[in-house]
Amino acid sequence: MVNVVLGSQWGDEGKGKLVDLLVGKYDIVARCAGGNNAGHTIVVNGVKYDFHMLPSGLVNPNCQNLLGNGVVIHVPSFFKELETLEAKGLKNARSRLFVSSRAHLVFDFHQVTDKLRELELSGRSKDGKNIGTTGKGIGPTYSTKASRSGLRVHHLVNDQPGAWEEFVARYKRLLETRRQRYGDFEYDFEAKLAEYKKLREQLKPFVVDSVVFMHNAIEAKKKILVEGANALMLDIDFGTYPYVTSSNTGIGGVLTGLGIPPRTIDEIYGVVKAYTTRVGEGPFPTEQLNENGEKLQTIGAEFGVTTGRKRRCGWLDLVVLKYSTLINGYTSLNITKLDVLDTFKEIPVGISYSIQGKKLDLFPEDLNILGKVEVEYKVLPGWDQDITKITKYEDLPENAKKYLKYIEDFVGVPVEWVGTGPARESMLHKEIK
């Protein structure tokens, strides 16, 4: 059994909380894309665990965890995150964590050039805007992967005669091409090389052939949960390009990032914030640059876990959700942070786009069009009631249930979970047929 948790908007929907809720039922949690450019917090027995790169299945002491071939790995950050989690009391994490030998490596110079590229782009653009990268080197790493010049985990840990010398030569060549492109930026090659010589020994026990790992697990009828990173609207192909990440963050990335066939997928859970947020630049049709947006930002505590940046806030965009559903094929939804809407008398939701009076059939791929669309809203009544202490779906206010029902009917997918507060237990389950 392979079930998948995916973000349906621009990230920060609360995927980690759903994974945390479900993880006790699974034998394996796997990540398939991205790196340490994402982030979420899980609270267990009052202890906060911040996850960026590592699978959040580590909070379950009986669960194995895999970073698949589609993930890009900054090895120093890998160990720093692991050590931070261990210092907070996470037990036997090292024996339950595995890394694909095919995963690509993020180096510090990728991070340096990530920031240089961002400055370059903001200088070129008419409005001074940039992509809004986290500066973690993710984009440049996927770029070297696509150009077939990148280095993978197996290049680093290979013990065969001459393998280390080959790694050094390729590492140096990769650095030189970056310097040719961005100038002679400061980078102590010898010091970094010495660091990686130590890290390779530390990394070796974690490395597996992830294709064999996954297919053995599937054959053994293991219960597997795939933890998506980022979200569909940040997908390199289907998101608001170029204001996207550099990997496939939808269902396609699950298949290619773990090396599994489509027929192995059972359930696909789409995580949806009850309103919409995004970090960084790019069109955002339902954004509220007013008191409503500020209220959503304040009540929702909308700051990025990885960057600390304030998130842009707006009403729920059902055009985005329908588009996301079309591509990812969600079998059920998790609506998160419904409690943030508790004090709104009326709650608009975006239901269609038009431009120059002409209604669009679907989410447009052209950002020049997307930036000019007019949004048609359906205004739904609020419930003006604190729902954070409610423990059963049936006890939600009628207007809250109507809000959820409207979402279900619009996208044609049932809501299975509803987030009603920041606590781990603040998640209501709704039976679906």
Curated annotation (Swiss-Prot):
The keyword Nucleotide-binding applies. Its cofactor is Mg(2+). GTP binds at residues 11-17, 39-41, 311, 337-339, 419-421. Keywords: Cytoplasm, GTP-binding, Ligase, Magnesium, Metal-binding, Nucleotide-binding, Purine biosynthesis. Its EC number is 6.3.4.4. Gene3D superfamilies: Adenylosuccinate Synthetase, subunit A, domain 1, Adenylosuccinate Synthetase, subunit A, domain 2, Adenylosuccinate Synthetase, subunit A, domain 3. It is found in: Cytoplasm. GO terms for biological process: 'de novo' AMP biosynthetic process; IMP metabolic process. Substrate binds at V305, T306, T307, G308, R309, K310, R311. It catalyses: IMP + L-aspartate + GTP = N(6)-(1,2-dicarboxyethyl)-AMP + GDP + phosphate + 2 H(+). The keyword Metal-binding applies. The active site is at D12, H40. InterPro entries: Adenylosuccin_syn_GTP-bd, Adenylosuccin_syn_Lys_AS, Adenylosuccinate_synth_dom1, Adenylosuccinate_synth_dom2, Adenylosuccinate_synth_dom3, Adenylosuccinate_synthetase, P-loop_NTPase. Pathway: Purine metabolism; AMP biosynthesis via de novo pathway; AMP from IMP: step 1/2. Mg(2+) binds at D12, G39. GO terms for cellular component: cytoplasm. Binds 1 Mg(2+) ion per subunit. IMP binds at D12, E13, G14, K15, N37, A38, G39, H40, T134, R148, N230, T245, R309. CDD domains: AdSS. GO terms for molecular function: adenylosuccinate synthase activity; GTP binding; magnesium ion binding. Belongs to the adenylosuccinate synthetase family. Homodimer. Plays an important role in the de novo pathway and in the salvage pathway of purine nucleotide biosynthesis. Catalyzes the first committed step in the biosynthesis of AMP from IMP. This is Adenylosuccinate synthetase. It comes from Saccharomyces cerevisiae (strain YJM789) (Baker's yeast).
